[in-house]
Regions:
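Interdomain hinge/linker segments and adjacent boundary elements that couple functional modules
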Residues: 2-3, 9-45, 53, 58-63, ...
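C-terminal regulatory/effector modules of DNA-binding transcriptional regulators
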Residues: 192, 211-318
Length: 318
C-alpha cells in the first residue's frame, strides 16, 4: 500500500514530451505514442512539482545531478527507468528529507520498475489502455461518467465482445483483448477496498451494441451492479432534469485516497487526455458530482434499467 506523500505539490510550469503547462500539473494528449504507467507518471509528476516549487530549471538540476537535461526530462515524464541512486540524488537537490515522503517516492519507483500483470497483452492493447489499467490498479475509488458507451468495468462479456469485434484488428487480436478485459474485471472485483462509482447517460443505454439479447442482459447486469457494496450507479436522464452538465463527456477520475493527487482520463475516437493539472481535475470532479447528485437514485435507476431490459427482450426474435 502506498502511503500519502507529505506536503502539497507546488505550481508546475512547462514540461516536455507533449505536456502543456498547467496551474498545478500537466495535461497529456495521447494517441499512439508510448504512455507511462500510473506509478511512473505519478512519480514523475511529484518530482517535477517539487522542482518547480523550488524554482529550479531542468538544466541546473541536471548539472547538479551529473546527467543530461534530456534524462531528467524523461524521468519527469515517466519515460525513464527509475534508479534508486538517481532518486537519492534528487532527494538532496530537491531538499526532500522527510522519511515518509522519501519512502513513498521510493515505493512508487519500486512498483514502477516491476513487471506488470498485463505484460502479455502489451502487443495488442493500445499504450493508453495499458496506462488506464495501471491507474485502475492503483486507485481506491474510480469515478466514471459514460456518455455514449458503458465503462469497461461495467460491461458484460457479451457486450464487451460485440464492442471489441466491431473495432480494428484481426480476430486473434480481438480474442486477446477479450482475455484482457476479463482479467481486468476479475482483478478489480478481487481487490479489497476498491469502489466504482458510475454515472451513465441515458443515451449510453440506448446505443445498441450487439443484439437485443445482449442489451437486455447488459441492462440487468447494471441493475445487479447497483446492489453491490463496491459499486454505485446513477442514471442521468434528460427527461427528468434540465440543464445537466453533460458536456463533461466520457471521463474517469482516479482517486488514490490522498496518497497522491487524483488523475482524470478523458477519451474520444482519436485519442485521450490524461489530466494531472489539479485545478482541471477538481473542476471535472465537481461536474461529475453534480451529474451524480442529479441522477436517478438506486431504486429509480433499477426500475429504469429493468424497463429497458424488458423493452430489449421484446425485440428478440421468437
Amino acid at each position: 500500500m502506498i502511503r500519502r506523500i507529505a506536503g502539497a505539490p507546488g505550481p508546475v510550469g512547462s514540461g516536455s514530451g507533449g505536456d502543456r503547462p498547467g496551474r498545478r500539473g500537466t495535461v497529456r494528449y495521447l494517441k499512439d505514442e508510448a504512455v507511462p504507467s500510473a506509478p511512473r507518471m505519478l512519480l514523475g509528476h511529484a518530482l517535477r512539482s517539487r522542482r518547480h516549487h523550488l524554482g529550479l530549471k531542468q538544466e541546473e538540476v541536471a548539472r547538479r545531478m551529473g546527467c543530461s537535461s534530456s534524462k531528467l526530462s524523461r524521468i519527469e515524464s515517466g519515460m525513464h527507468h527509475f534508479k534508486e541512486k538517481d532518486l537519492l540524488r534528487l532527494f538532496v537537490v530537491y531538499e526532500i528529507s522527510g522519511e515518509k515522503e522519501q519512502a513513498v517516492l521510493l515505493e512508487l519507483a519500486e512498483i514502477a520498475n516491476q513487471p506488470t500483470w498485463w505484460q502479455e497483452w502489451s502487443t495488442v492493447a493500445q499504450p493508453y489502455l495499458q496506462a488506464v489499467i495501471s491507474f485502475e490498479d492503483m486507485a481506491t475509488r474510480i469515478k466514471a461518467y459514460s456518455s455514449d458507451l458503458l465503462h469497461g468495468l461495467a460491461q458484460t462479456p457479451a457486450y464487451a465482445e460485440a464492442l471489441i469485434r466491431r473495432g480494428r484488428g484481426e480476430r486473434d487480436t480481438h480474442d486477446a483483448l477479450l482475455g484482457l478485459r476479463k482479467e481486468r474485471r476479475a482483478r478489480f472485483e478481487a481487490a479489497p477496498g476498491k469502489k466504482l462509482i458510475i454515472v451513465v447517460h441515458a443515451a449510453a443505454l440506448l446505443n445498441r451494441v450487439g443484439s437485443p439479447e445482449i442489451m437486455a442482459d447488459q441492462m440487468e447486469h447494471l441493475a445487479g451492479l447497483s446492489e453491490r457494496r463496491n459499486h454505485q450507479l446513477r442514471l442521468v436522464d434528460p427527461a427528468h432534469h434540465y440543464d445537466l452538465p453533460v458536456e463533461l463527456g466520457t471521463t474517469t477520475i482516479f482517486d488514490f485516497e490522498g496518497r497522491v493527487p487524483k488523475v482524470a482520463y478523458a477519451e474520444n475516437l482519436d485519442g485521450c487526455l490524461f489530466i494531472q493539472d489539479e485545478d482541471l481535475v477538481d473542476h471535472r470532479e465537481v461536474v461529475f458530482d453534480e451529474l451524480r447528485f442529479k441522477g436517478l437514485g438506486p431504486d429509480a435507476a433499477r426500475r429504469k434499467l429493468n424497463d429497458l431490459a424488458r423493452m430489449y427482450r421484446k425485440f428478440q426474435a421468437p
